[in-house]
């Protein structure tokens, strides 16, 4: 795949392209992906904390269970199904076991549950927050919530590309 952009109009490599150049392109992309992933990871952790803090403060630690706390209650059911799968998939994680074993209802508070979210799930969660809640989180970054929503969606897309190892150039 790394050599595809180096082919000429006749779909053949020009004589000036070497295997070593294709390897260098691959290595550049691998390093670039790692750099992007490192930056995105910092953004993800920061956003995860701010969303969890705001949402839990306004709606309580189990507020994620109430569809009225979201912009689109219809999406809420899909969200809960996704979360149940994540809890099941991570059932051996120490903090999941702790809440399951030590609390009578076994429910996981949002500030802990958010740790199971993929960046894509975090992006969808933010997108389905009520406008005033999105605005409150976006204000912490000094931007409008429509900008933050768009940026988070695009960052999630780039993160997925980094994760599967596709070329970025």
Predicted regions and their residues:
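Long, contiguous internal "core" modules enriched in hydrophobic/ aromatic residues
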Residues: 2-168
């Amino acid at each position: 795949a790394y050599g595809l952009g180096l082919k000429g109009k006749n779909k053949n490599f020009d004589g000036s392209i070497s295997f070593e150049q294709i390897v260098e392109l691959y290595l550049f992309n691998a390093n670039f992906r790692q750099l992007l992933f490192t930056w995105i990871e910092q953004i993800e952790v920061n956003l995860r904390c701010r969303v969890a803090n705001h949402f839990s403060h306004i709606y309580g630690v189990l507020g994620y269970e109430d569809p009225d706390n979201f912009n689109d209650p219809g999406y809420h059911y899909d969200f809960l199904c996704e979360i149940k799968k994540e809890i099941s998939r991570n059932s051996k994680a120490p903090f999941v076991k702790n809440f399951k074993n030590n609390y009578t209802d076994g429910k996981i508070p949002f500030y802990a549950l958010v740790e199971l979210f993929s960046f894509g799930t975090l992006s969808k969660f933010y997108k389905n927050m009520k406008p005033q809640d999105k605005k409150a989180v976006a204000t912490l970054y000094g931007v409008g919530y429509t900008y933050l929503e768009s940026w988070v969606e695009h960052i999630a897309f780039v993160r997925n590309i980094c994760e599967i190892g596709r070329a970025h150039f």
